């Protein structure tokens, strides 16, 4: 069964699409492996350094307030990178923007390695590898720990560009057919999480113990460079640069200075307008942005706190994240294999909302510190939470790509798909950037008030509020959003808004098509066109199966995974 599904899915794509998909998947795996090594190391490094600073100076711990600020600012700078994508992908090939972004990311990670080496940093001592003292990190570089914040923040610009563009490029590779997009998104997510799971476990079990978290991301610049080279080999995908109307009457230097700022806000405004003025998209805000916030806070906020304060070893947060990545892998796999059975993202998003409630066990969990098997237990419990999120994310991303591909021409200076994804991604980033430092400060307050590092401080009351209570609220909001789309009250709806998306499109719909892409008539037929093809409801790269003559090369393909149908 599995092999037949894989063969059928692979046969959906043309030879050129298969080549580009293979290059894209190899690049995304290289990128993800390097990313996991960097993100896991930097959070553990910051956690240890701030704890060590408090220990040496005999001061009150502000570890998770600072770690929250570190990750929050990184997310805020991702906002800039995400917004810049919408105008950039209309002026340069997507592969070029992606390659340059990931090269910039690798460069800034190399800067941090050089700073540590210049200030006297060393690899972890051999006698620390099997039994690391709880508060001895004297082998780290002698720089101000707050110096991590600006460097990590700047990497957020490149990170935000890469994370958003990888949600846009599948549409460029295979077009607007939702069947192809669902399969491609799921396929990419599967390999992405295979690499992410391997990267997380490799970082926690090999790189950090052998090198220390100040050098465990030494592989990141290498992997990022390899990913950039791989992505650059993708074909240009029929790219045609589009002329910028913003400040077009001004000299080049004025356009260069001001145009980016205006397009930044126009992109955000366009995405917000598309979302808030149409029922088709309003539910994406909680379904995508808030769900993504919950997933990221689980990995970047709760997992480090559990690893350091419950288990006594910040490096084990990567084991927990590895379990989360494995859940994402399984979730994406389920979407891949059941794409024809579950045709909308609604059931997956509802599953995601229910799985968030698993965190209720954390405030009542008392694992003995220093035993790695309890980190594995936490990883196993994070698996189903991320399973639900990944399944919803993959399916919802394909839905967004297919829907927005049909209204691209309504936007002038920015891509409609890029603008909507940028707005959703920016909303998540702003939410995370605001809440992460505040919740981190709350964790530190509870820890210090209950005794701190010297007197058995306990963060369980904080975990009750930032974990159990917060995630219950998120669950309710996400679950409620799944009842907004027309036709979503069914347990497994076959279609939303009576809109058929599993068809090919040649290009975006006409400006006067509006967003009302499939309006039912009183007689039960449909009057809306999905694309420019005349003579039928389903737009595409091919002519209508009802209009073309026998022997014509223009055959309508309704479900490309089932082959081409001739009249």
Each PLM stretch: what is its role?
Residues 90-107, 127, 211, 339-358, ...:
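Cytoplasmic membrane-interface "Motif A"-like loop-to-helix N-cap segments
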């Amino acid at each position: 069964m599995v092999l037949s599904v894989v063969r059928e899915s692979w046969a959906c794509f043309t030879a050129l699409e298969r080549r580009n998909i293979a290059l894209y998947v190899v690049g995304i795996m290289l990128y993800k492996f390097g990313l996991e090594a960097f993100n896991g190391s930097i959070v553990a490094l910051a956690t240890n350094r701030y704890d060590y600073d408090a220990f040496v100076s005999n001061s009150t711990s502000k570890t998770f307030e600072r770690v929250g600020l570190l990750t929050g600012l990184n997310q805020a700078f991702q906002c800039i990178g995400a917004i810049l994508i919408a105008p950039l992908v209309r002026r340069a090939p997507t592969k070029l923007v992606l390659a340059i972004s990931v090269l910039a990311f690798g460069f800034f990670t190399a800067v941090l390695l050089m700073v540590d080496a210049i200030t006297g940093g060393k690899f972890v001592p051999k006698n620390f590898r099997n039994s690391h003292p709880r508060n001895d990190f004297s082998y780290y570089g002698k720089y101000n720990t707050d110096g991590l914040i600006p460097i990590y923040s700047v990497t957020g610009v490149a990170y935000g560009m890469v994370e958003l563009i990888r949600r846009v490029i599948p549409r460029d590779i295979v077009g607007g057919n939702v069947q192809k997009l669902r399969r491609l998104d799921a396929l990419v997510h599967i390999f992405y999480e295979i690499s992410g799971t391997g990267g997380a476990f490799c970082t926690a079990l090999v790189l950090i113990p052998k090198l220390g978290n100040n050098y465990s991301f030494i592989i990141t610049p290498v992997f990022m460079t390899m990913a950039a080279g791989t992505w650059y080999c993708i074909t240009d995908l029929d790219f045609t640069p589009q002329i910028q109307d913003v400040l077009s009457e001004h000299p080049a230097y004025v356009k260069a200075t001001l145009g980016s700022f205006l397009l930044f806000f126009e992109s955000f405004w366009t995405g917000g307008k598309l979302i808030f003025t149409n029922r088709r998209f309003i539910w994406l805000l909680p379904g995508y942005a808030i769900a993504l916030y919950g997933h990221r806070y689980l990995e970047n906020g709760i997992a480090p706190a559990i690893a350091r304060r419950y288990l006594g070893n910040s490096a084990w947060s990567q084991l927990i994240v590895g379990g989360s990545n494995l859940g994402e892998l399984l979730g994406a796999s389920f979407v891949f294999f059941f794409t024809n059975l579950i045709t909308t993202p609604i059931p997956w998003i509802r599953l995601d909302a229910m799985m968030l409630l698993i965190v209720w066990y954390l405030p009542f969990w008392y694992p003995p510190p220093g035993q790695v098997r309890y980190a594995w237990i936490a990883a196993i419990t994070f698996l189903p939470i991320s399973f639900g999120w990944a399944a919803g994310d993959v399916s919802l991303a394909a839905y967004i790509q297919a829907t927005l591909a049909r209204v691209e021409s309504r936007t002038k200076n920015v891509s409609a798909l890029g603008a909507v994804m940028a707005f959703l991604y920016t909303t998540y980033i702003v939410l995370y950037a605001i809440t992460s430092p505040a919740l981190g400060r709350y964790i530190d307050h509870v820890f210090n008030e209950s005794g701190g590092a010297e007197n058995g401080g306990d963060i369980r009351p904080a975990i009750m509020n930032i974990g159990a209570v917060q995630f219950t609220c998120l669950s309710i909001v996400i679950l409620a959003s799944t009842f907004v789309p027309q036709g979503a009250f069914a347990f497994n709806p076959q279609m939303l808004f009576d809109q058929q998306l599993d068809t090919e499109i040649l290009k975006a719909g006409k400006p006067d098509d509006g967003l009302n892409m499939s309006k039912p008539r009183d007689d039960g037929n449909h009057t809306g066109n999905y694309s420019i093809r005349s003579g039928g409801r389903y737009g595409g790269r091919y002519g209508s199966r009802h209009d073309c003559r026998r022997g014509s090369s223009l055959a309508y393909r309704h479900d490309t995974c089932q082959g081409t149908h001739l009249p």
